[in-house]
Amino acid sequence: SRGLGDVYKRQLIEQYAAYLEKKNWSRATLGIVMRNTRTIINRAIKKRKVSYNVHPFVDYSIPQSPVRDVSIRLESLSKILNAEVDSNYLSVARDLFSLSFYLGGINMTDLMDMDFRNSRYIQYSRKKIMGRTSNANVIILPVHEKAACIIAKWMNPRTGKLDFHYNFTYKNFSRHISRGIAKLAKELGIKERVVYYSARKTFAQLASELGIPDGVIDYCLGHSDKSRGVIRYYAKVKEKQAEIAINRVIDYVDHPEKYKEFLEMRADIMLMKS
């Protein structure tokens, strides 16, 4: 019967996962493979190539990667954003890191694919989310003046995209920049581990410290919207809130002394609530 067939398919998924686990892959790699498998099944269902009474993944939980704690202290972040460098290599590394931070923690793949010819705002859907769902959110974020200066420095006016005059594949370019960021951090005397992703994690951390709501931080980061029922007006509100959030986080980095009293008061309130 179809019921027994569905049970068998669910067992097959679990057996497949057990087979992959024997390869001693990391949880991150196993999670990627199983998510891709689920995506293939979902697309087949959507195209009516297969049908199930019960989804094969209903009893299987995809392993989650451990959260990478690569956020850095405000002082370290400020050193990188304001670093004076004497090589093109470190200049590119610093500017890409800075752009990620100034644009709400944007991922490198989305940043490199962005058309910046509209100088006031960027609009995109995260590639990482687009690969998992057909309902990917469109994110609209302001281009802060600090980001605009960097964009003007590197943008190809014909394509609107950043052009660093490297003839690398994206994968090799990403590795090249990662090494550059690590080298820059070392030269600046930063002891923490610093990677491109640190800009994203640190933006989220500072925004949280300032009391910016999680929903607004998620919007800036481009996290998928699980509600799926967001009306147009609400989306417009999120855009404005995101603009305020980004401006406030950048102002906090530039003028931390302005926020000292607020942060101390907020810490006291959080302590009383705990």
Regions found by a protein language model. Name each.
Residues F116-I122, K191-E192, I212-A235, P256-A267:
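Short, polar N-cap/turn motifs at the start of nucleic acid-interacting alpha helices
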Residues H144-K191:
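Active-site/catalytic core of tyrosine-dependent DNA strand-transfer enzymes
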Residues D86-S87, S178-Y219, H223:
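Short, basic (Lys/Arg/His-rich) helix/loop patches that form interaction surfaces
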Residues M112-I150:
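Conserved tyrosine-mediated DNA breakage-rejoining catalytic core shared by Y-recombinases
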Residues S71, R126-R132, L221-H255, M270:
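Catalytic-site neighborhood detector that most strongly recognizes the C-terminal catalytic loop/helix
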Residues R27, G31, Y52-M108, M112:
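Basic, Lys/Arg- and aromatic-enriched nucleic-acid-binding interface segment
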Residues G3-Y8:
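Short, small-residue-biased leader/transition segments that mark boundaries at the very start
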Residues E145, R158-T159, N167, R228, ...:
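C-terminal secondary-structure termini that scaffold catalytic or DNA-interacting sites
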